[in-house]
A protein has these predicted regions:
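Conserved phosphate/pyrophosphate-binding and hydrolysis machinery centered on Walker-type P-loop NTPases
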Residues: 27-31, 55, 68-75, 98-102, ...
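Conserved RecA-like helicase ATPase core segment
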Residues: 1-68
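Conserved helicase C-terminal RecA-like lobe
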Residues: 137-368, 372
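Conserved RecA-like ASCE P-loop NTPase motor core of nucleic-acid helicases/translocases
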Residues: 24-26, 63-70, 78-129, 136
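A polyampholytic, Gly/Pro-enriched intrinsically disordered region
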Residues: 43-45, 73, 137-159, 386-404
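Helicase C-terminal subdomain and adjacent C-terminal extension
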Residues: 344-406
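Short glycine-/polar-rich loops that comprise or flank the Walker A/P-loop
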Residues: 16-21, 60-63, 93, 115-117, ...
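Conserved nucleotide-binding/hydrolysis micro-motifs of P-loop NTPases
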Residues: 4-7, 27-32, 60, 72, ...
Length: 406
């Protein structure tokens, strides 16, 4: 569990003289091919785990490593793979997708939502439930329906100098007004309501597409949100807007967008047909996954710089903790293990070692994986045409705040 000291078990004999160790090497969950790859990962450690799991169930199929140009292609492929298995008669709940953090799964969430695949997120907050996304969507809610009191309340409270009392008073003056232009004119006379906040709504209402409206609102609110979330993973939050922007391209109006993804969200289990509430894909953070298992497991974005994560590379102990994290993810699979990754890297570029004290560690855990342990499928194109153009995370300046990716 998080925060535990593995040395308590690893050095148990030293700490408890006269004790004996009984090794439980028979594994009842996974097939031998999955365990062979997991055993190989632990075997690369400088720590002497001396742990070789044997599958009670015998042999199965080789794990696969699927490599993509970027996270959007990675997410799209996973969704198509899920749909193929569904068409073959499988249930959604036979699939589990493991990710490091909620932020790292946003492109995947967008693809699941767009494809109307029901899912539950364990260990993280869903895309449309995050505060920064709700903040921007409050503007779209007002533009679509000027009588949306909750939308007005959330939007006005984003701006400095406006508290609950001021916002409530202002809203009471426009609550029965079905014209956004008239509401804006009334609020312009309120001393504490900024003209900038109203101009964003005005410009957004003039947009010809949902995507254009969304971009106007994000652009206008950018500094306000940056200040609000400057110490709360702002750089990661920006990337969520790229996912929403892509989803906004699938609808013809703001109201249709809100109805599709906010008012009647297909990603909630409550939206499933009666009797199928549990038939959902599980998206789960690895730190929440101990004890979990599933027929088919996808381990998301096992890319260079991610396993081990870059910031762990100044400590051998941290690198070994990263190894155990990946080991936990891989051993959740019962029948099929699919590891996905993305980026423009080669085997040579990711195979270098890092020296820490008197030991050398891998910069990337899968850099020298043995061919007999897995099947490699490289989906990358010769050129990177599918990268997001004009994405919010690229088009806006990076914050100066140091970001903790966890």
């Amino acid at each position: 569990f998080r925060g535990a000291d593995f040395q308590s078990i690893h050095k148990f004999n030293e700490k408890v003289p006269g004790s004996s160790v009984l090794k439980l090497s028979l594994n009842y969950r996974s097939t031998q091919e999955i365990l062979d790859l997991s055993n190989w990962l632990l075997g690369k450690s400088h720590l002497k785990y001396d742990k070789k799991l044997i599958a009670y169930r015998g042999k199965g199929i080789l794990p696969t490593v699927e490599t993509f140009t970027n996270e959007w292609e990675e997410a799209s492929w996973i969704v198509e793979n899920l749909k193929e298995h569904r068409e073959e008669g499988e249930r959604w709940d036979e699939n589990m997708i493991l990710c490091r953090t909620g932020f790292s799964a946003r492109a995947l969430e967008g693809a699941l939502i767009e494809s109307k695949i029901p899912y539950v997120f364990i260990g993280g907050r869903k895309l449309f439930e995050t505060a920064h996304v709700k903040d921007v969507l409050s503007a779209l809610r007002i533009i679509a329906n000027p009588q949306d009191d909750l939308g007005w309340m959330r939007y006005l409270l984003l701006w400095g100098g406006v508290g609950d009392k001021t916002a409530s008073t202002a809203i009471s003056q426009i609550t029965k007004n079905d014209s956004l232009d008239q509401s804006i004119e009334i609020l312009k006379r309120h001393p504490k309501i900024s003209l900038e906040s109203l101009e964003i709504l005005k410009q957004g209402s003039l947009a010809e597409t949902t995507e254009e409206c969304f971009k106007i609102c994000v652009d206008g609110l950018f500094k306000v949100l940056e200040n609000k979330y400057k110490n709360k993973n702002w750089e990661q939050r920006i990337k969520d807007f790229d996912v929403i922007q892509r989803l906004s391209q699938t609808t013809t109006s703001i109201l249709e967008f809100l109805e599709a993804y906010i008012l009647e969200p297909i990603y909630l289990t409550e939206a499933l047909p009666k009797g199928n509430e549990d038939d959902v894909v599980t998206v789960i953070t690895i730190h929440s996954a101990k004890g979990a298992e599933c027929k088919r497991c996808y381990v998301l974005n096992v890319s260079p710089g991610g396993y081990p994560i870059t910031r762990s590379m100044n400590s051998g102990e941290s690198i070994e903790e990263e190894r155990r994290v990946l080991y936990v993810a891989m051993t959740r699979a019962k029948d099929e293990l699919i590891i996905t990754r993305s980026g423009n890297f080669s085997s040579a570029s990711s195979s270098s070692k890092i020296q820490i004290e008197d030991k050398k560690y891998e910069r990337y855990f899968l850099s020298d994986i043995k061919d007999k342990l897995f099947k490699n499928n490289d989906h990358r194109l010769l050129n990177d045409d599918n990268l997001t153009d004009g994405s919010f995370s690229r088009s806006f300046p990076k914050p100066s705040t140091k970001i903790d990716l966890e």
